[in-house]
Regions:
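Loop-to-helix entry and N-terminal half of a specific, functionally important transmembrane alpha helix
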Residues: 21-29, 71, 204, 336, ...
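Transmembrane alpha-helices of multi-pass inner-membrane enzymes
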Residues: 46-51, 228, 360, 378-388, ...
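Transmembrane signal-anchor hairpin modules in multi-pass inner-membrane enzymes, especially those
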Residues: 1-88, 116-117, 123, 187-199, ...
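Long extracytoplasmic/lumenal interhelical loops at the membrane interface
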Residues: 282-297, 301, 305, 309-349
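A membrane-periplasm/extracellular boundary helix in multi-pass inner-membrane enzymes
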Residues: 215, 235-282, 297-305, 313, ...
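Alpha-helical transmembrane segments of multi-pass inner-membrane proteins
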Residues: 118-151, 167-237, 257-261, 367, ...
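Transmembrane alpha-helical segments and their membrane-water interfaces
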Residues: 31, 51-61, 83-136, 169, ...
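Hydrophobic transmembrane alpha-helices and their immediate junctions
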Residues: 54, 233, 244, 348-385
């Protein structure tokens, strides 16, 4: 019996030490989200090991489930899991579920996440995006090469003309747009008290915006312009005229700068015009925008015959191939997904699954914490997600991890019996050391 107790029991003091360590690791995880999927996966593996070693699962799951949003994340995951039972393309289904498994991460995160770490986690993600931006500038100014390999191990790989080092240009610009919007909001509501951090935030907003103009991710531009309006509305919602004036002024200034001084932005606007002309005049959909339009068209055709429960988690592209192989055979070679999450989910798991997904987003948008700033950051991130889901992706390693981690941090409302020190120079150095270790692990995996 004593042996069983030793195996099954761990002291409360040690449990609290593990909880503190897991919170610190989640800070590292957040920093790595925009930088290295393999490195952040290694961090999560360590968190999972600590979660298992801490034991006492029932009590900690009770703490996690005190947050009503958790059940909606899990419910959406279970819908896709159920969709596996009637799918034919199991390989595609397994690939999708490997990404969608992040939906159940809040079950683990909320079982240890202390609310005092919430903004530290958010700040870590912001600094991760800042690091990515700095590397992007170093590549753009040809201070470092566009590709960096150490032996057979890839550090990053991009091009001088579109220097998004760690993510593709769409994801890179989305990350910048979200961080710019969050920082503008925090400055407007005076959430950042330290004068040096205020100056740093203002510099980051400026350089991040300029960096976006160097990158060819059109989705990021749209997300940024719409989020600017949202941020101003959240801050000045009682003064609607002021909202429109400030929002339109900022958006107009940004647009004029990009259109007149950004070759990449100008090129992407011209590309969009040419794509649209080609679709209208020549019925040619073999272009960036055209492929999204034609893929959406065939996805709608799939939905028409399978609107209730869909075709299964992995069968959407297979069904699109069947419908398009005679008239538009190039589609299946050029696109790997419908490029519209709303249509994709409708095709995968039908109107039932779609309703559950939208219910999850609705519950997140209307969720109230004890802090208005948290509520509004949740709104900024959720609205951004709902926007980039239209032409882009959500169930990917970057987008879903970003969404789940930051939302978990913002909705966390529990204080564990742990001592949380303010972040100082020494603790920042420790974070940097741990980040470097996990980056090395990620690179060599």
């Amino acid at each position: 019996m004593n042996l069983i107790n030793k195996i099954c029991y761990i002291s409360k003091e040690n449990q609290n030490k593990i909880i503190l360590l897991m919170n610190h690791l989640l800070v590292v995880y957040a920093f790595l989200i925009p930088i290295s999927n393999k490195a952040k996966t290694s961090v999560f593996f360590c968190i999972l090991l600590l979660f298992l070693y801490r034991r006492n699962f029932i009590d900690y799951f009770k703490i996690a489930f005190k947050n009503e949003l958790l059940k909606y994340f899990i419910l959406l995951y279970l819908v896709f899991l159920l969709g596996m039972s009637y799918t034919n393309d199991m390989d595609a289904a397994y690939i999708f579920m490997n990404k969608a498994k992040v939906l159940i991460y809040p079950l683990i995160f909320l079982s240890f996440l202390d609310m005092r770490f919430s903004f530290r986690i958010l700040n870590a993600f912001i600094f991760g995006v800042l690091f990515s931006e700095i590397v992007s500038y170093l590549i753009h100014f040809q201070i470092i090469p566009p590709e960096l390999f150490i032996g057979e191990y890839k550090i990053y790989q991009t091009v001088y003309t579109d220097p998004a080092p760690f993510l593709n240009h769409i994801k890179h610009n989305i990350a910048l747009a979200i961080v710019i919007s969050v920082l503008i909001y925090r400055l407007l509501v005076n959430d950042i008290k330290n004068i040096y951090l205020k100056i740093l935030s203002f510099i980051f907003i400026t350089t991040a915006f300029i960096n976006m103009s160097l990158i060819g991710g059109r989705t990021g531009y749209i997300v940024l312009f719409l989020l600017i309006f949202l941020v101003v509305f959240l801050v000045y919602r009682q003064k609607i005229k002021k909202v429109f004036f400030i929002s339109l002024s900022i958006i107009l200034i940004m647009f004029m700068y990009m259109y007149n001084f950004s070759k990449q932005f100008d090129k992407r606007v011209e590309d969009a015009k040419n794509d649209i002309k080609s679709m209208i005049n020549e019925k040619n959909y073999d272009s960036s925008i055209g492929l999204r339009i034609i893929a959406s068209y065939y996805t709608i055709e799939v939905i028409k015959d399978n609107y209730l429960v869909g075709v299964g988690t992995g069968d959407v592209m297979q069904e699109i191939q069947k419908l398009s192989k005679d008239k538009d055979p190039y589609i299946i070679k050029r696109v790997k997904s419908p490029h519209n999450i709303y249509l994709q989910v409708l095709a995968q798991v039908g109107i039932i699954g779609f309703f559950i997904m939208m219910l999850m987003f609705y519950k997140i948008l209307t969720y109230k914490t004890l802090d208005k700033k948290r509520d509004n950051i949740i709104k900024i991130l959720t609205i951004a997600t709902l926007i980039f889901m239209i032409p882009g992706n959500f169930f990917e390693f970057f987008e879903l991890a970003m969404f789940v981690t930051i939302i978990s941090a913002m909705i966390s409302n529990y204080k564990f019996d742990i001592f949380v020190k303010e972040a100082d120079f020494k603790s920042i150095l420790k974070y940097i050391l741990v980040i470097i270790i996990f980056l090395i692990i990620g690179i060599t995996k």
